[in-house]
């Protein structure tokens, strides 16, 4: 469905949450945030996901990333459900806020509606959507999963690392990249510019085409 996507400014919505009223742009501030939706409280896959989010909170804190959840259940439902989440994974405290969107207007604006999943009243449910939003309030990366597939927190962390590395060093990250591994130099950077920008040097792959577009370097 059309809607919020990479490069768009996230709507500055204000919603009730488990931490009181939250205005999204104020919550972002000058940091990255992970804005994620879940189909419903007191459901099995969502319980495992939000418990994992809580367990990874320290990893996100290290990277200066804040978590912000949203679903269509009301705030009291969220608060009651958190007790189950924390009981399921003792030690994983849900310290991040979860916003309430019973009208479903926010999830529509955030492009988080699952077209195939509905509640008992026929109302659309949120998908397992996740937007990584940058300090400029723009969506940097989005994941969209169906209700039957839980998200992979290791991949979310890896994506954050890749985005922050790319932004800091003006590079790109190749397939399956992890921190400490080589990055690639974007094709818009000439070899002369690359020599200045990356004094540590770079390697160019020897390809049959003879085109020197695949260049690897290391960054700190």
From Swiss-Prot:
Gene3D superfamilies recorded: Antioxidant, Horf6, Chain A, domain2 (3.30.1020.10), Glutaredoxin (3.40.30.10)
Gene Ontology molecular function: thioredoxin-dependent peroxiredoxin activity
Residues annotated as the enzyme's active site: 46 (cysteine sulfenic acid (-soh) intermediate)
Main localization category: nucleus
Enzyme class: oxidoreductase
Role summary: Thiol-specific peroxidase that catalyzes the reduction of hydrogen peroxide and organic hydroperoxides to water and alcohols, respectively. Seems to contribute to the inhibition of germination during stress.
PANTHER family in alphabetical order: MCG48959-RELATED, PEROXIREDOXIN-6
Protein name: 1-Cys peroxiredoxin A
Organism the protein comes from: Oryza sativa subsp. indica (Rice)
């Amino acid at each position: 469905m059309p809607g919020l996507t990479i490069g768009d400014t996230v709507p500055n919505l204000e919603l009730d949450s488990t931490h009181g009223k939250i205005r999204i742009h104020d919550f972002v501030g000058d940091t990255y945030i992970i804005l994620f939706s879940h189909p419903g409280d007191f459901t099995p896959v969502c319980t495992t996901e939000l418990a994992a989010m809580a367990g990874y909170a320290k990893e996100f804190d290290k990277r200066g990333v804040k978590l912000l959840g949203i679903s269509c259940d009301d705030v009291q439902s969220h608060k009651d459900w958190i007790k189950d989440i924390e009981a399921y994974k003792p030690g994983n405290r849900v310290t991040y806020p979860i916003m309430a969107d019973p009208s479903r207007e926010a999830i529509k604006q955030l492009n988080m509606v699952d077209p195939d999943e509905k509640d008992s009243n026929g109302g659309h449910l949120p998908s397992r959507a996740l937007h990584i939003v940058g300090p400029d309030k723009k969506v940097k990366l989005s994941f969209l999963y169906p209700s039957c597939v839980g998200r992979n927190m290791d991949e979310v962390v890896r994506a954050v690392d890749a985005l922050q590395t790319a932004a800091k060093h003006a590079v790109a990250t190749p397939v399956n990249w992890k921190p400490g591994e080589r990055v690639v130099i974007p094709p818009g950077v000439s070899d002369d510019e690359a020599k200045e920008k990356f004094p540590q040097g770079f390697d160019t792959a020897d390809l049959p085409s003879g085109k020197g577009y695949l260049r690897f370097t290391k960054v700190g």
